[in-house]
Amino acid sequence: MPLASLSLDPAPFPLIRPAAGWSGRVLPVPGPAPRLCRPLRAAPVAPATTDEPSAAARGRLESLSQVAGVLGTQWGDEGKGKLVDILAQRFDVVARCQGGANAGHTIYNSEGKKFALHLVPSGILNENTQCVIGNGVVVHLPGFFKEIDGLESNGISCKGRLLVSDRAHLLFDLHQVVDGLREVELGNSLIGTTKRGIGPCYSNKVTRNGLRISDLRHMDTFGAKLNNLLRDAALRFKDFEYNSKILKEEVEKYKRFAERLEPFITDTVHFMNQSILQKKKILVEGGQATMLDIDFGTYPFVTSSSPSAGGICTGLGIAPRSLGDIIGVVKAYTTRVGSGPFPTELLGKTGDLLRASGMEFGTTTGRPRRCGWLDIVALKYCCQINGFSSLNLTKLDVLTGLKEIKLGTSYYTDDGNTVQSFPADLDLLEQIKVKYEALPGWEEDISSIRDYSDLPETARRYVERIEELVGIPVHYIGVGPGRDALIYK
């Protein structure tokens, strides 16, 4: 939905504090739908067709390396799943390498049906694609089976097509309970997690008392290991409920899970390396994004894994020299869910318009996303870390109707000194000022455009200015949520 089709009441949504109360900022929650206003002026283009890819599309798809990756460049929610779904048609294997059910990827099949995936790789909609959940992923089996049931009820078979690493760690309900208790304990300093138990599960992994998928093959010792986790949680949190009955029920539940999961369990490290030797094409689907990386993100307001290029190797067990093209997915503006610094955040009417037009509510949590201008400083930082070969600019259509669009091109301090790089210091990030470059917007509806040359001149100028500033070419441009709403440049 483009911006020009919206007008907002002075206070269209009730306001609430963000989860962490970061700097006293406020966020809107869903309320009455925005009112429609005058229709858009359509750009003169031929109707889009999805029967055969264009020459530009074929060129881009066929030139990708044997092992390629798709990673987020902001704070998640960039639209990675859609690109993976499209690219997967040209790949033999699609793999997840890190994170868990905190990653929410919304994709659409050829009939326009919407699927919200959290653990299962987005390539599952392509019937000839093998999907892999790698050793770096943490797996919540109840959620995993729920996704599979939802897919199979819609005619999408997962049997024989979905492999789960025997080295991946199990995420239990207890991890989700601990996640919530930890957030309550932190009070006003809470991180604003998805409360999916990701952090506590990775914590057990690092302290070497977690359980892995392979432990499901040894139910004689499974109960004792799970008992250690439950007991530790009860000792740490007084409100954590734990007794022998709970342990027995959990063990019985996981006996059933073990039987159902067995056909999926695979030594995926061996599978991935054999696939490389067999010259199969492999696409890696990153969860979250670089600005949430445990090392490179806005720590501590980050995730617990490495959603950067380095996480591909550690999360799948493949060599760095195997990697080829890495595509960075970047929204045409910036969004963030939860707490943490956000230098280019828009707190007024324009931010509300972006949120409403872009339907900016989290796939995993439903929380309203904070919105702001595209942050070039942060984007360049992500490009340096990951070595992107190209970018996928998404949701360009959402900016339609804005008379002026801004790019945050540099940071400076109160005394006027330029900050040369993206800082680790959160206090500095909170106080930092942003220098903006303003570009003219466009009024035309671009959602049906499939040829780059048919975009309004000002839209092309926006894309090309981003390329100039970050030094990375934009090869893919999203102009709508549908699978076909993509321009190959």
Curated annotation (Swiss-Prot):
It catalyses: IMP + L-aspartate + GTP = N(6)-(1,2-dicarboxyethyl)-AMP + GDP + phosphate + 2 H(+). The active site is at D77, H105. Binds 1 Mg(2+) ion per subunit. GO terms for biological process: 'de novo' AMP biosynthetic process; IMP metabolic process. It comes from the Eukaryota. Homodimer. This is Adenylosuccinate synthetase 2, chloroplastic. It comes from Sorghum bicolor. The gene is PURA2.
